[in-house]
A protein has these predicted regions:
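Short, glycine-rich nucleotide/cofactor-binding loops
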Residues: 5-19, 44-52
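N-terminal beta1-alpha1-beta2 submodule of the flavodoxin-like/Rossmannoid cofactor-binding fold
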Residues: 28-29, 33, 39-52
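C-terminal binding/interaction regions
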Residues: 105-112
Length: 113
């Protein structure tokens, strides 16, 4: 089995796709198809989840509780002013490039939404 990294960048420009990405991440995390499923948030997705509705928040809480969410980019979270909201949801903030490099080094399969 492979390890899977989902990079979610889609945000308010396509909220339906952003919700699909979150739901897909949750389903993959629960499926047992992979050794490990991790999610990185980057760009507009951070603004989307930082201002999310109750349904989206519930999906995020479940992803966090499954230890699926690795982090969101600290620089982007600051840019959008959502760092407190993200950390309150249990999402760690870290430099995106460093986190991505660590998963590439570990040979995770990468899918971007």
């Amino acid at each position: 089995m492979k390890d899977l990294l989902l990079i979610i960048t889609t945000g308010n420009e396509n909220p339906e796709m952003a919700r699909f990405a979150l739901t897909g991440a949750l389903r993959q995390a629960k499926s047992g198809r992979y050794n490990n499923v991790k999610v990185l948030f980057y760009g507009p997705s951070e603004k989307f989840i930082g201002n999310s509705d109750e349904s989206t928040e519930n999906t995020l809480k479940e992803l966090v509780s499954l230890n699926t969410v690795d982090s969101a980019c600290i620089a982007i979270a600051k840019f959008y002013g959502v760092e407190k909201k993200l950390t309150d949801m249990g999402i760690e903030l870290a430099p995106f490039g460093e986190r991505l490099a660590s998963y590439i080094e570990k040979e995770f399969q990468v899918i971007t939404f």
